[in-house]
UniProtKB/Swiss-Prot annotation:
Keywords: Coiled coil, Developmental protein, DNA-binding, Homeobox, Nucleus, Transcription, Transcription regulation. It is found in: Nucleus. Disulfide bonds: none annotated. Its main location: nucleus. Residues 553-604 form a coiled coil. Residues 78-94, 160-170, 237-249, 289-301, 309-321, 331-352, 394-443, 458-482, 559-569 have a biased composition (Low complexity). GO terms for cellular component: nucleus. Residues 773-835 bind DNA. This is Homeobox protein 12. Signal peptide: none annotated. The lineage of its organism: Eukaryota, Amoebozoa, Evosea, Eumycetozoa, Dictyostelia. Pfam families: Homeodomain.
Amino acid sequence: MTSTANNNTSFYCNNNNSNNNININCCSNTGHNGNNTTETTLTTVNEERCAPTPTPTSTPPHGSALNIQNSNNGCNNIIGSSSNTLSTPSVQATPPTPPPSSSSLLVQPMIVTPSPVVATTSSLITNDDNLNSSTNYLMLPHQAQSSAMTIVQPPPPSTPLSSSSTVVPASTPPPSVMTPITTIQTTATPPSLQPTIHHQTALSFLGYTYNEQYQQNICQLYHQLNANGNGNGNGNGNHNNNNNNYNYNNNSFYQHQQHQHGLYYNQFPIPMNSSVPIIPTQQYIGTKQPQSQSQSQQLQPQPQPQPQLQPQLQSQPQSQQLKRKEASYHNNNNNNNNNNNNNNNNNNNNNNPYNRPTKKIMVSQGLPPISSSPSFQNLNNKYFDFNQPITRNNYNQVNYNNNNNNNNNNNNNYNNISNNNPCNNNNNNKPNNNPNNNNSNSNKTYINKQHRDYGYENNNNNNNKTFQQTSQQQQQQQQQIYKKQNCNNYIDESGDDESGEEYQNYQPYQQYQNFKQNNKDNNNNDDDDDDDDDEEEEEEEEDDNDNCNGNDSYDEENNNNNNNNNNNNQFKNESIIIGDNYYEIINDRIKSIKQKLHFLEKNSKFQWIREKSFNFINEFTGESVVNEELGIRGSKDFSYLKYKTLNPSLDNYITQERIELKNPLIKANIEKLKKDFNFEITKINTTKSESLEIMKSIQQLSTTVRSPLLDRSDLKAQRNHIHGFFTLIIAHQKCLSFDFIYQMRPQSMDHQHGFSNTFTDDFTNGGGCSISDKKNRRTLNDQYKSFISDYFKNHSDHPYPNEDEKIIISALIDLSKYQRNNWFSNKRSREKNQRIVNLKKQIGFH
């Protein structure tokens, strides 16, 4: 018997309890690599093994799984690929010794030297050619022979253990009980004192009891796996002869709830009627660290527990044992011809990346993840690494069940839908209705994207449903409606319906042209107001859709329900999201808007609103304003003031107030005031020009995207608003300067009066001011007087301007705040007296 292996591995077991042949690689002087074939030899546990020469490698980090890489000169006893190998430093190994007698099958307690070997990952060779990566198992006990670990025996109980002397002669009889290793030697042992490594010490580092019966059970399990096959691959000829069929179910998948206890479980595909025990591994390294102890306590010998032949399942909590559900494996394959369907089964399984054979499923060994462990991203390998954390991406891919309905000479793979023609009345285009495909899963998933689009699922019964399952009757009804609506626009590009190639449902451009043509027809009918003709055309189109499938009758109730839910009837390939009646809805909305506008034009209230808005805009553009355009400040309108100009200068006010600039003190103050005032005016004008430029740029950008929303009158009103706002700011600055200059006027008059008394009378009479001049009031010129008089006449019913109006009036006619208020108060008093006199004349009162 020959076997093909992809990794440098070997396996020892007893074939006495197996009725089937199995590909086992044993001790060989040449080894095997790649695809080399090697004759296998079955040996027992008590047979002598050859001693390999260890190969030195680097020391692995703490908490990592260990594996020993051996040379090919001797026996490769470690089950594991070289790609996933981590080794310990090179240590001189002693010649191997024969294993103990069959009466003493239990492992003696050992103390590990600084080589921190705790466990190994291994790989199991199978006879499946499609197996691209190894299946991970725990390292079996006899594999410790080839490990580069130094093991020393503990001293007798009467001898105290110390850090300086910890070596005991190798002739010490082994105890009858194996205990977990918790004491690590801190000093190196001379090579001469290193004892022989026992065959069955591998599981001692994991804390298990071990016997020969357990090894035989493992071998028997391995034989059953190879004999029964996976139900999909090369084992179709044998798997029906035995009830122990394996189809990896979701119930035996790795449970996330075990993370919180820090324990992993070996997920062996064990049948329900099998007596092979399930072995829990040691506490997961890295999840829960043991409690720290002092160095003296760690060096104390551990007490010997009672003998125990089976794995220590009793020591675990009962709730933790219940979390590990019993594995139930079902083979849902209906093979009508087991001799002729091997190729068909392999092809169907290879087409769907989520049909994973049982033997290609990696088994969780419960050890820390190896950095070079295979990833689930490669779907060609069709395995799942339970060491990797389960995420949404790989968990959905795991939950796919291996349920195929394989018939004679039938290559249709229902997991990958090939016949998607909606107008094809072939009955083969149906979902897989396998009655055995009913599994209780925690999360519902679809087989692939096409099944999700068509609403086909695995018919899983679960409490938390991710997607709403559609019944078979609703699916048929939707398919019938879809065919009636889209068969005219369907273009079959797949050729043969049974070829299995995917097709393109239809061309989106052609669909758009059909909608566009229908839209034009609807517009022509709307212009003529022929609603009856539109209904007749729609009925004709429905008749055409009925005739496309050869159906003479059509269910009107289903058609009405479809018309009410046309927005949800989207095309299945997700290439177009526009409903069938999308353009019809738009035309109806446009028609309703036109009717509303036509109704508003006849309404008198609507006409009044239009006229009022038109007049409101003309108020800002019909009259000249300050700087040719003043506009509004906020919602206030100052256009009625009829400002022609606003000169931002203080010279006119200084001249009219007759301020004497010959005084050095007054002159210095005026010059300083002018400097600050001119700086503020320049800053305000710059800001105004920037605002106007921004408004112009925004208008230009808006016209490139759409038609201008504002006409010339609206744009002019916006400009007036900007001009009026900054003009008001300048007016405030000018009035504040007037107030400062007005306070300097008495000082100027006093200086002129005192200066005339000091100097000659000629100078005083010629250029100075007399005492009478100091008391004289300022009179306005004709221009300013006519302006303020007109404003007062226009507002005679309420001659009390607001603050903004007062500021602008003061800036226009060069009056300070005090002079302006005085003028308005005097004007109102004179007007009041004048009205009283006129009233007395009318009534004849003397």
